[in-house]
Swiss-Prot record:
Name this polypeptide is given: Glutamyl-tRNA(Gln) amidotransferase subunit A
Region span, Disordered: 471-509
Organism in which the protein naturally occurs: Synechococcus sp. (strain JA-3-3Ab)
Record: active site: K75 (charge relay system), S150 (charge relay system), S174 (acyl-ester intermediate)
A cellular component term, taken from the record's GO annotations: glutamyl-tRNA(Gln) amidotransferase complex
Length: 509
């Protein structure tokens, strides 16, 4: 059952108040935070204020929406007016934005209760949340492992029930990869469906804000609250927003699902491949037609991304110079101040990407690197377009392996390979969702479902059908009973219904 729906029912029947729910989640957050370190800033005072406002509306007989009174965590690269927004960087350690991001403003207007700002890789550059300047977030399933990144704090907070849902950002997999590592659902929407106004930019043509939740329905409800045109974002799409809850039908008979052959081969771990193949077979048992799809340009996705994204980052991060806001190091000249401020303010990974991007954009190498990468990006988009002429959605593993040990991947290339399967979706601007499809040695494995432009409803429908016929999403990390189950007195730790690891029947395409 959707956690949002269950809590909403308790609120409207006055079984519990929004303040009671907020206090329970804040208590659990505080209890687990020394172990997990999911949050950079906890906004207890704001949360209780927002919860009391919802209770006042209920007492006045006002009808509340499904998001009212629901505890929310926000990735700390989304600007929140009057609340510290650091991007997990020394550069913005004390920065308090004078304005609010569109997505957080919309959710506040819907009555959501913000419990805090979550940890991330510095400026959203990383795949493990180890690049934060302040702390390393732990994976709730195994505290010695990473939660993924860059939205690792948001994923860990939802997995550990420190919040019901969370916001993240996804530039090359930063919602889907940590969702897979932490055993929750994460969605990167179509580029332009959700406003980026107030999201601190990493790579502007790739960044997208999206939701985390325990269930597909929770993610659909949060997406409903943030999707839609925003005149403050020049890349925002002017399209009609459907009711995503209407897509949640556990019936996919006749759906054509493409299996991306290129992402199930070399580079994919054996346990991950087995779990995803079992999930594909299960989708076939639900009535879907399975086709194998070739996307040959995907093999160049990683190289393409690591030219385009750092190039955009080198431009976007030029604004952090110590002049208008953020860190400023004293120096004898303006040029020296720039150098000292950026040397102290940025961490190693951010500096690395700025250097790569500056090199790719330099006069002698622009055509050889940046321009060529943009051409390959077009080829990747064309591969997707050809695939969607034959199928409704595509599926693949979300990550090559389950979560790895903290400190295990110090080599940048081995870290970059974590996003091998998610990057093509960002380069094409498509919607992609990760949901749990199995476990290996007690660690979650994610199934990625990819849709065509603005086809979030199809992605959600396939994800919902799979979720409702399995029990993977009901498993909980070994961290004690979460607030909702305490209130209901029903702790659950079921086994999944679908255990088959045999390959599915496929027709070649």
């Amino acid at each position: 059952m959707s956690v949002i729906r269950a809590l909403h029912r308790q609120l409207v029947t006055k079984e519990r108040s929004a303040e009671e729910i907020a206090r329970e989640y804040l208590e659990r957050l505080a209890q687990l935070e020394p172990q997990l370190k999911s949050f950079i800033t906890v906004t207890e005072e704001l949360a209780l204020q927002q919860a009391k406002a919802v209770d006042a509306r209920i007492r006045a007989g006002e009808e509340i929406g499904p998001l009212a009174g629901i505890p929310l965590a926000v990735k700390d690269n989304l600007c929140t007016q009057g609340i510290r927004t650091t991007c997990a960087s020394r550069m913005l350690e004390g920065f308090i934005p004078p304005y609010e991001s569109t997505v957080t403003a919309r959710l506040a207007a819907a009555g959501m209760v913000t419990v805090g700002k979550t940890n991330l890789d510095e400026f959203a550059m990383g795949s493990s949340t180890e690049n934060s300047a302040f702390q390393r977030t732990a994976n709730p399933w195994d505290l010695t492992r990473v939660p993924g990144g860059s939205s690792g704090g948001s994923a860990a907070a939802v997995a550990a029930d420190q919040a019901v849902v969370a916001l993240g950002s996804d530039t090359g997999g930063s919602i889907r990869q940590p969702a897979a590592f932490c055993g929750v659902v994460g969605l990167k929407p179509t580029y332009g469906l959700v406003s980026r106004y107030g999201l601190v930019a990493f790579a502007s043509s790739l960044d997208q804000v999206g939701p985390f939740g325990r269930t597909v329905e929770d993610v659909a409800l949060l997406l409903q609250g943030i999707a839609g045109h925003d005149p403050l974002d020049s890349t925002s799409l002017k399209v009609e927003i459907p009711d995503y809850s209407q897509a949640l039908i556990p019936e996919i008979k006749g759906f054509k699902i493409g299996v991306i052959r290129d992402l199930l081969g070399e580079g994919c771990g054996e346990e991950t491949r087995a779990a995803v193949q079992a999930a594909i077979q299960h989708l076939e048992e639900l009535g879907a037609e399975i086709l194998e799809i070739d996307c040959p340009s995907f093999r160049y996705g990683l190289a393409t991304y690591y030219i385009i994204a750092p190039s955009e980052a080198s431009s976007n991060l030029a604004r952090y110079d110590g002049v208008k806001y953020g860190l400023r190091e004293p120096a004898d000249s303006l040029l020296a101040m720039y150098g000292k401020t950026r040397a102290r303010g940025f961490g190693p990974e951010v500096k690395r990407r700025i250097m790569i991007g500056t090199y790719a954009l330099s006069a002698g190498y622009y055509d050889a690197y940046y321009l060529k990468a943009q051409k390959v990006r077009t080829l990747i988009k064309q591969d997707f377009l050809r695939a969607f002429e034959k199928v409704d959605v595509l599926v693949s593993p979300t990550t090559p392996t389950p979560a790895f040990k903290a400190g295990e991947r110090e080599d940048p290339l081995s870290m970059y390979l974590c996003d091998l399967m998610t990057i093509p979706v960002n380069l094409a601007g498509l919607p992609g969702l990760s949901l749990p499809c199995g476990f290996a040695n007690g660690l979650p494995i994610g199934l990625q479902i990819i849709g065509n432009v603005l086809q979030e409803s199809k992605v959600l429908r396939v994800a919902y059908a799979y979720e409702q016929s399995t029990d993977w999403h009901k498993r909980r990390p070994p961290l004690g009973q979460p607030p909702l189950e305490q209130a209901q007195g029903t702790a659950q730790q079921p086994k999944a219904k679908s255990k088959s690891t045999k390959g599915s029947k496929k027709s070649k395409s």
